[in-house]
Swiss-Prot record:
It is an enzyme of class 5 (isomerase). InterPro entries: IF-2B-related, IF-M1Pi, IF_2B-like_C, Initiation_fac_2B_a/b/d, M1Pi_N, NagB/RpiA_transferase-like. The active site is at residue 246. NCBIfam families: eIF-2B_rel, PRK05720.1, salvage_mtnA. GO terms for molecular function: S-methyl-5-thioribose-1-phosphate isomerase activity. GO terms for biological process: L-methionine salvage from methylthioadenosine. Belongs to the eIF-2B alpha/beta/delta subunits family. MtnA subfamily. Transmembrane segments: none annotated. Its EC number is 5.3.1.23. Disulfide bonds: none annotated. This is Methylthioribose-1-phosphate isomerase. It comes from the Bacteria. The gene is mtnA.
Length: 358
């Protein structure tokens, strides 16, 4: 399975080449494939904030490379680079407040600096750590894909119709995706007959990104309006909803793309199983429940400005980017560390704190 998945990999969104971070600008997809070259931390933070790069894992990876660029700048300035670098940590942390992987990556980079030995080259050490973060995410994608497809096979042995929402694919990770990784594996194994993708307003990650990724790989995909998804579950024989996560609280509540919560409610009503696929770095045990997850809200212009012209004036806009799906609506959370069915505080604590002999 691993070799087949790697052979099928066609889309990548993050490259570290020649001492610069190259990001596929996801704001322009699918009409234009343009790469942004970031050679300083301000450009990386802007790319994260403005959603040129998006997806929790991808944001964390980009931030790690952003710190490498920041350190290079600080060393060239010749001042107190350790003190100055704190400003860069803060700049990156503030770019997208909901993505748990962002803070995990920044903390891991900070810990690497604290372990620095006197004889080590600080820039080389930090660059190696960023590369390791990138590579570990790719490996996590592979593991999650294999675990997720085993769950789907166990539930029903024949080819199935799956529904996904948002974009939790190669564009949102360092590999070939979390939710879409499971879907890709399922298609290769003959377990997925068709994928339905919700458009995912207002940024249209489903129609612009997920449908584009799946079509590029020849996976049968049907695009649906967000308002049609409950009807879809009722009429099209959907067996699983498979989504990613931006942050998972200690009790199993999941923050994901706005609209995921209502999708989970519909899935529960229609007897459709609900799977969340996310690396363990998305789990924050310091957040007791979903109520503690900071939920980003974006500018009203994303709803009021269409094609450069105002659609309506003098109205207020509520534009949250994420919502929280309660743990009791989730059948299973798939991570690279293992699978948690019917998640709760005890099960997630056991997953994260599990002692390993090897």
């Amino acid at each position: 399975m691993r070799e087949r998945l790697l052979a099928a990999e066609k889309v990548t969104a993050i490259r570290w080449q020649g001492g610069a971070l190259h990001l596929l600008d996801q704001r322009l997809l699918p009409s234009e494939e343009r790469w942004l070259a970031c050679d300083n931390v301000a450009q990386v933070a802007a790319a994260i904030r403005d959603m040129a790069v998006r997806g929790a894992s991808a944001i964390g990876i980009a931030a790690a490379y952003g710190l490498v660029l920041a350190l290079e700048e600080r060393l060239a300035e010749g001042g107190d680079w350790e003190m100055d670098l704190e400003d860069d940590f803060l700049t990156l942390a503030e770019a997208r407040p909901t993505a748990a992987n962002l803070f995990w990556a920044l903390n891991r980079m900070r810990e690497r600096l604290l372990r620095l030995r006197p004889e080590e080259d600080v820039l080389a050490a930090l660059e190696a750590e960023a590369v390791a973060i990138h590579e570990s995410d790719r490996e996590a994608n592979l593991t999650m894909a294999q675990q997720g497809i085993e769950l789907i096979r166990r539930h029903q042995g024949n080819a199935q119709a799956l529904l996904t929402f948002g974009n939790a694919g190669a564009l949102a990770s360092g590999g070939f995706g979390t939710a879409l990784g499971v879907i890709r594996a399922g298609y290769l194994e003959g377990m997925v007959e068709r994928v339905y993708a919700g458009e995912t307003r207002p940024w249209l990650q489903g129609s612009r990104l997920t449908a584009w990724e799946l079509a590029n790989e020849g996976i049968p995909v049907t695009l649906c309006a967000d308002s049609a998804l409950a009807h879809l579950m009722k009429t099209k024989g959907i067996t699983w909803v498979v989504v990613g996560a931006d942050c998972i609280a200690a009790n199993g509540d999941v923050a994901s793309k706005i609209g995921t919560y209502q999708l989970a409610v519909s899935a529960m009503h229609h007897g459709v199983r609900f799977m969340v696929v996310a690396p363990s770095t998305s789990i924050d045990l310091n957040l007791a429940t979903g109520e503690d997850i900071p939920l980003e809200e974006r500018d009203a212009d994303e709803w009021l400005d269409f094609g450069g012209a105002p659609a309506v004036r003098d109205v207020q806009v509520f534009n949250p980017v994420f919502d929280v799906t309660p743990a009791d609506l989730i059948d299973v959370i798939v991570t690279e560390r293992g699978v948690v069915e019917r998640p709760d505080t005890a099960k997630l604590a056991q997953l994260i704190c599990r002692k390993r002999l090897h």
